[in-house]
Amino acid sequence: MKVILLKDVAKLGKKGEIKEVSDGYGRNYLIPRGLAVEATKSELSKLKNIEDQKKKKEERTKANSEELLRKIKQRHFRMKVKAGASGKLFGAVTSADIAELIAKELGTEFSKRYVDLKENIKNTGEYKVNLKLPGNVKGSIIIAIEKSEED
């Protein structure tokens, strides 16, 4: 008997996979517990529709992320922060600060989860910051950390 898994099943497969199982295992264990449904033509067409929608959504997400990355790369980002005479910052610049700067510059929302900062920035200068956007889109920007004039 062929079944479509509705949930991950240990030693059998992952959600959405079509598996061949014995009739007893399918009818007496998987189907009653809501772990699988019998692989009929209508269920297979539902699965195909769901997979197509998922694929379209992923493509849309990737396209939006690539467009956002293109807009980000067209800009030069500067952040003015309080720092000592030696260039050491009073505090640190975090991924949340960088995300806030990007969001402000672009006039859109930008999550701190998209900023891949290994460690907080603690000195003035130019830094390469990696970005990981949804849809597995990766890129990097250069951000200039400058001492603010106000003391």
Curated annotation (Swiss-Prot):
Domain of life according to the entry: Bacteria
GO MF entries: rRNA binding; structural constituent of ribosome
Keyword Ligase appears in the UniProt entry: no
Gene Ontology CC annotation, any one: ribonucleoprotein complex
GO biological process, one term: translation
InterPro entries: Ribosomal_bL9 (IPR000244), Ribosomal_bL9/RNase_H1_N (IPR009027), Ribosomal_bL9_bac/chp (IPR020594), Ribosomal_bL9_C (IPR020069), Ribosomal_bL9_C_sf (IPR036791), Ribosomal_bL9_N (IPR020070), Ribosomal_bL9_N_sf (IPR036935)
Keyword Translocase listed: no
Keywords linked to the UniProt accession: Ribonucleoprotein, Ribosomal protein, RNA-binding, rRNA-binding
PANTHER family reported in the protein's UniProt record: 50S RIBOSOMAL PROTEIN L9
NCBIfam families: L9
Family: Belongs to the bacterial ribosomal protein bL9 family.
Protein purpose: Binds to the 23S rRNA.
Name the UniProt record assigns to this protein: Large ribosomal subunit protein bL9
